[in-house]
Amino acid sequence: MITNFFSVLTPFTFTSAISFNFPSFSSLEPNISFENAYANEDKVIQITGSKLTPWYHGRATYFRPMHLWDKGSKNLTDFATHFSFVIDSQNLSNYADGVAFFLAPNGSKIYRASNGSDLGLYNPALNSTENSFFAVEFDIWSNYQLDPPREHVGIDINSIISVANVSWLSNITIMEGNLNEAWINYNSSSQNLSVIFTGFKNNVTVNQSVLYCWFEKGPTWMG
């Protein structure tokens, strides 16, 4: 479940910057596109299954596309986002794959035939250039040959095999359905992508991080 969302996207001129803040959600919100997802009675976005609808995946995207990079100048866009979310296994040891923040080409749709490991983004029938997306995955299920053998946070670029990942101290938060937070920042000048997120160690919430130098160009407009 996504509980709140704040994002600032700063392209090449200040006047074209995009900023939005959602302290709560409604399924009637015109600025969010829901695919197999909805805002529940707690005013949070439900994007995976519940006891009534297991093995379910969905996603929610902001309606306005982001100018990710300029072909003429070769400039990339700075962006920063902060959101909070809950993954609740409902005290079950066999649970789903997790949740991801993503950027995908404008107009892209959820891949409905995907397995949980595909994040609703990756289509195994396509090649690496056709699978165009960026994602930060909060992965709680280890898929053989795709993931490290542990809960982890990974950075994905056009593939569900992460280019960088770090162990996520998340087991207690998953079993108890506790709140998690994440901050994702990209500085186009330094090409540094920073992901800071909360974990849980010795009954105390701790901050963890994963970094990556991202310079690859992709589609001009992302959503």
Kindly give the residue locations of the regions a language model identified:
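Polar, low-complexity loop segments and adjacent catalytic/binding residues used for recognizing
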Residues: 1-223
